[in-house]
Regions:
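Nucleotide/pyrophosphate-binding catalytic subdomain
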Residues: 1-216, 384-385, 404
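Short phosphate-binding/catalytic loops that engage adenosine nucleotides
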Residues: 34, 90, 224, 288, ...
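Conserved H-loop
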Residues: 41, 231, 295
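Short hydrophobic alpha-helical runs that function as membrane-insertion/retention elements
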Residues: 168-172, 226-228, 291, 372
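Surface-exposed amphipathic alpha-helical tracts and adjacent flexible/coil segments at the periphery
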Residues: 211, 222, 233-239, 314
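Acidic-aromatic/histidine active-site loop/patch
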Residues: 219
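Active-site C-terminal subdomain of aminotransferase-like
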Residues: 224-235, 259
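A conserved regulatory-domain signal marking ACT and ACT-like small-molecule sensing domains
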Residues: 237-407
Length: 407
């Protein structure tokens, strides 16, 4: 008998009919002789609606109280789903994050899981019950409810799978697996049968919406057997694993687009040691991640440094740098929020010459200008104007998945 952890996102549990469908999937898995732990997200737009309600009451509500409020969305999902499963004649129990033993740090709204006390879940499984767990939440050392931030339910599911030594962790979404690009916006996108942890991590980090990078990092660390599939189609999904059979044949596994990007340029910096350190240490102290970096040296012993941050961090980054203008000594600061990042990812890229050239040629042929470039062993990213982003993804995808024929 296998132990299977299943996770269902907000779109999968959005209304009564979809909840019944999720209950059917869970009970069918259980009837095959498996133990089942299912992690559920809040229904549809529930979390956004709760945030709006909070803003009406107090736009400056504390993060602790926001976590108390937002955690209720997932609790509604698990209790309704449990009622549905009960009505089908199965034994089931729903558990909030704290009841499931999900222990976190005290970073309200962005908590990290420290460990999981699995005794309660195991006790319920031993009673042959289906266990439903509220995703996205836990409890800290002060017995306060915390939420895990973006991707929290994915992370909850993978963490539970690791702690329970589950045989499989299935992530159910509204698409039936991991595609070479977003099938909702890119013509010709193909589903992948399998993908490596490293490739999935890069795609998740570069804007692919299927899995959150935190959950992929955890799955890789604990070697969790991971599968992404649709709660609607019933078709086989995509397996995410350490090594895939098709790796030697594959140059590029996917093309991702990220519009949550802003470009910041510091112009007229002194060309001397320590300047870059000063800039990026200031941002790091405030938790602002920097991605693509470009430095250019002028003829007048000055230099310019350009870099990208999340668009949501751009205003804060601009404020921090302007406050330290005298210490950093720059002539001008420019912020451009009308940009997007296009990335190609593939484990086979490192050993195949010409991949970057092919990407750049595709963009050139489409008349798209490249503003910045970043490369690693399995990823190439370029910054383009936001208005060109959709065309850029389509052009690059068309070139690779006809040129190399890989999927």
């Amino acid at each position: 008998m296998a132990l299977i952890v299943q996770k269902f996102g907000g779109s999968s549990v959005a209304d009564a009919d979809k909840l019944r469908n999720v209950a059917r999937i869970i009970t069918e898995t259980y009837q095959k002789g498996n133990s089942v732990v299912a992690v559920l997200s809040a229904q549809g737009d529930t979390t956004d609606d709760l945030i709006e309600k909070a803003k009406e009451i107090n736009p400056n509500a504390s993060k602790r109280e926001m976590d108390m409020l937002l955690s209720t969305g997932e609790q509604i999902s698990i209790s309704l789903c449990a009622m549905c499963i009960e009505g089908m004649g199965f034994q089931v129990v729903s558990l909030a994050g704290w009841q499931a033993g999900m222990l976190t740090d005290s970073s309200y709204s962005a908590a990290r899981i420290k460990r999981i006390r699995t005794e309660r879940i195991q006790k319920e499984l031993d009673k042959k019950k289906i266990v439903l767990v509220a995703g996205f939440q836990g409890i800290n050392k002060y017995d306060d409810i915390t939420t895990l931030g973006r991707g929290g339910s994915d992370t909850s599911a993978v963490a539970l799978a690791a702690a329970l030594h589950a045989d499989l962790c299935q992530i159910y979404t509204d698409v039936d697996g991991v595609y070479t690009s977003d099938p909702r916006t890119v013509k010709g996108a193909r589903k992948l049968d399998e993908i490596t942890f490293d490739e999935m991590l890069e795609l998740a980090s570069q804007g692919a919406q299927v899995l959150h990078n935190r959950s992929v990092e955890m799955a890789k660390r604990y070697n969790v057997n991971l599968e992404v599939l649709s709660s609607f189609s019933g078709k086989p999904g995509t397996k995410v694993k350490e090594v895939v059979k098709t790796m030697e044949k594959t140059h590029v596994s996917g093309v991702a687009k990220d519009k949550n990007v802003a470009r910041i340029a510091l112009v007229g910096l002194a060309d001397q040691p320590g300047i870059a350190f000063k800039i990026f240490s200031l941002l790091a102290k405030k938790g602002i991640n920097v991605d693509i970096i470009l430095q250019s040296i002028g003829r007048d012993e000055s230099k310019d440094i350009s870099f990208t941050v999340a668009r949501s961090d751009a205003d804060e980054a601009e404020r921090i740098l302007n406050e330290e203008k005298e210490a950093i000594k720059f002539k001008a600061l420019e912020v451009n929020k009308q940009v997007a990042k296009i990335s190609i990812v593939g484990a086979g890229m490192a050993n195949n010459a010409g991949v970057a050239c092919t990407m750049f040629e595709a963009l050139y042929s489409a008349g798209i200008n490249i503003n910045m470039i970043s490369t690693s062993e399995i990823k190439i990213s370029v910054l383009v104007d936001e208005r060109d982003a959709d065309r850029a993804v389509q052009a690059v995808h068309d070139r690779f998945f006809s040129e190399f024929g890989n999927a």
